[in-house]
C-alpha cells in the first residue's frame, strides 16, 4: 500500500504519499496471519484459519495443533445445516487452500487422502485445477477421478461438458478442458 501511495504521489509530481481512497476509510481492521507454531504461515494453515477460524500448525490441513481434532470448516457447517456447498479454486482442487474447506490431514501433502475426503464431503460442486497426484500408484483404488465418480460425482472437462451435465448431476466437478 505504501509503495502504491508513493507511486501515485510521484505520478502527480508530489514528494511523499498520495493517499489511496481505502486508506482514508474511517475504520481499520487488523489481521494476524501467523500459524500456531510459526510466525510465517503456509497456505495449509492459512486456509484452515480462513475456512474454520482456527489457527493450526504450518503444513496441517483442517486439523488443530493437538494433531487429533478436526477444525470444522464453514463449508462443512453449511452442509450440516442442509445448504448446498460449492468450492472453487484456480489451483488443483486437492491443494491446501481449497482442501482446507473439506479435508482434515496432518500433512498438506497427503493428496490422495485429500482427494478421498473431497469425494466423501458430499459437497455439490467443485471447480478448479485437476487433482494433484491423481494416480498415486501406492493405492489400489483407481485414482482420484474414479474415487470421485464412485462417490456419485460427474466430472466435466470444460464449460461445454459442464453445461451439458449440470442440470442432471447431483454433484459435479468442473475441471479445465484438456488439450
Where are these regions (language model features)?
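N-terminal catalytic scaffold of extracellular/periplasmic and nuclease hydrolases
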Residues: 1-137, 142-166, 170-171
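Active-site-adjacent mobile loop/cap segments within catalytic or ligand-binding domains
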Residues: 176-179
Amino acid at each position: 500500500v505504501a509503495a502504491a501511495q508513493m507511486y501515485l504521489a510521484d505520478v502527480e509530481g508530489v514528494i511523499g504519499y498520495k493517499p489511496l481512497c481505502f486508506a482514508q476509510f474511517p475504520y481499520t481492521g487488523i489481521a494476524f496471519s501467523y500459524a500456531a507454531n510459526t510466525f510465517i504461515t503456509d497456505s495449509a494453515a492459512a486456509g484452515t484459519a480462513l475456512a474454520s477460524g482456527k489457527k493450526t500448525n504450518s503444513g496441517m490441513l483442517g486439523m488443530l495443533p493437538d494433531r487429533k481434532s478436526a477444525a470444522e470448516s464453514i463449508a462443512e457447517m453449511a452442509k450440516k445445516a442442509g445448504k448446498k456447498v460449492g468450492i472453487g479454486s484456480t489451483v488443483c482442487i486437492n491443494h491446501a487452500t481449497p482442501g482446507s474447506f473439506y479435508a482434515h490431514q496432518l500433512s498438506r501433502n497427503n493428496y490422495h487422502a485429500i482427494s478421498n475426503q473431497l469425494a466423501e464431503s458430499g459437497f455439490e460442486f467443485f471447480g478448479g485445477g485437476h487433482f494433484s497426484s491423481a494416480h498415486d500408484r501406492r493405492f489400489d483404488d483407481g485414482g482420484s477421478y474414479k474415487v470421485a465418480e464412485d462417490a456419485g460425482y460427474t466430472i466435466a472437462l470444460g464449460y461445454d461438458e459442464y453445461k451439458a451435465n449440470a442440470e442432471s448431476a447431483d454433484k459435479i466437478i468442473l475441471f479445465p478442458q484438456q488439450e
